[in-house]
A protein has these predicted regions:
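Juxtamembrane low-complexity tails/linkers enriched in Ser/Thr-Pro and polybasic
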Residues: 1-6
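Structured catalytic-domain cores with a bias toward divalent-metal coordination
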Residues: 8-396
Length: 396
């Protein structure tokens, strides 16, 4: 009897150990995929009917503002797309200006550099973007392309670089101070600076720097609840100003680039930038969002260090692109007549990846913290899907 009891006890321990090991393996699999697998797929043949190459992307001729979204801030491919798409807009759609989700003052210094003004170097221009996420070779390549283009262009054909964010006011103040130094004038406060500069010919861009400084002051005093709403409202207002400013020199399209969540035509819980722009410009505002099958994303860690973490979007379209071995593909939501099944999918809620400039271990165990569940056709006019998004290499 004692031997039988000991044997049963031994077997019981083995079973418990096996179940514990299986639970650990299941947990590891869950936090790796954000579920027990990377999600569902759509029919391969249906997907192939509508999938296009990036080079084949076309947008309507009436578009005034073209927006390129990014599913994360920490992937090389999404930054490379900024240059790829901007070059296409310049060469095929008479686009003369690019605006980035970055502080206005820093981008004004970049604009001076690409126009050959002042003593700033290419390194200075990249550094002026301030946000760590932009200290990359990919953003340097975009700035270099614009600077090289302008060296060969007539003054009225030159490209311009703008920022529509206002989270750092230091460079806004620097630009305003430089303007008043050049004018040999003084200002009492930033309201006075904005009012004075807007009435002086050639100083409109510096007046906008003063306005962005004031926006930052309001944003700094906002509650956590109101912060995102105020920021996105001002970003929409700034893009509207940039577009109108661009038209004064030479009527042309404006390309903007920011996170998917900012540029999307529909907001989730509050009115974001893209929704405001869509309400004003309607079909003249054209948005291409992005997503990934798998991302190894560069994210902020503790003590200012950068880390890389892996996530899966569970996007059925991205899963299909992965299964077909398509590194990067484009779906134009207005050209889905060849596949009613795909058209039906993008007009229903589906999971998509979404990572900002923040990370917590909870992201690994709470998939909804890095995914959205929304209707693609209500957010975008088309989507670029990246199979495997690789991390950016931040230089500073």
């Amino acid at each position: 009897m004692k031997k039988d009891y000991a044997k049963k006890r031994y077997i019981g321990k083995i079973i418990v150990a096996f179940l514990f090991g299986a639970a650990i393996m299941a947990f590891i699999r869950y936090i790796s995929y954000g579920g027990m697998n990377s999600g569902t797929q759509v029919n391969n043949e249906e997907f192939l009917k509508v999938a296009e190459e990036i080079d084949d992307i076309a947008i309507p001729k009436n578009v005034k503002i073209f927006a390129l979204g990014e599913a994360t801030h920490g992937n090389k491919e999404f930054q490379e797309l900024k240059l790829d798409m901007f070059r296409k807009m310049v060469e095929e759609y008479n686009c003369k200006a690019f605006a980035l989700e970055a502080d206005y003052g820093g981008c004004l210094l970049v604009n001076q550099y690409i126009h050959g003004e002042g003593k700033n170097t290419e390194d200075d221009a990249v550094e002026a973007l301030a946000f760590h996420i932009y200290q990359t070779d990919e953003m340097r390549a975009l700035i270099r392309y614009m600077a090289d283009y302008n060296k060969q262009a007539k003054p009225e054909e030159m490209l311009s670089f703008y920022g529509f964010d206002m989270q750092n006011s230091d460079l806004d103040q620097k630009c305003v101070d430089e303007a008043f130094s050049e004018l040999k004038m003084q200002y009492t406060d930033m309201e006075d600076a904005a009012e004075t500069l807007k009435n002086i010919p050639g100083m409109e861009m510096y007046a906008q720097a003063a306005r962005c400084y004031l926006q930052n002051q309001e944003l700094s005093n906002a509650s956590n609840v109101d912060y995102a709403k105020i920021r996105d409202h001002y970003m929409a207002e700034n893009i509207d100003w940039i577009y109108e400013h661009v038209q004064k020199g030479n009527e042309s399209m404006l390309m903007i680039s920011g996170h998917n969540g900012h540029v999307a035509k529909k907001s989730t819980y509050t009115t974001f930038m893209g929704e405001e722009l869509f309400e004003k410009y309607g079909d003249d505002y054209f948005v291409i969002g992005t997503d990934f099958y798998k991302t190894e994303c560069n994210l902020p860690g503790k003590n200012g260090k950068r880390i890389t973490r892996k996530f899966y979007s569970a996007d059925p379209l991205a899963n299909t692109a992965h299964a077909l071995g398509m590194d990067m593909t484009y779906l134009d939501f207005d050209k889905l007549q060849k596949s009613e099944k795909i058209k039906e999918i993008i007009n229903k809620n589906m999971l998509m990846g979404s990572l900002g400039e923040g990370y917590s271990f909870l992201n690994k165990i709470l998939p909804n913290s890095y995914r959205i569940n929304d209707v693609p056709a209500e957010l975008y006019d088309g989507m670029i899907i990246v199979k495997n998004a690789t991390p950016t290499d931040i230089k500073n």
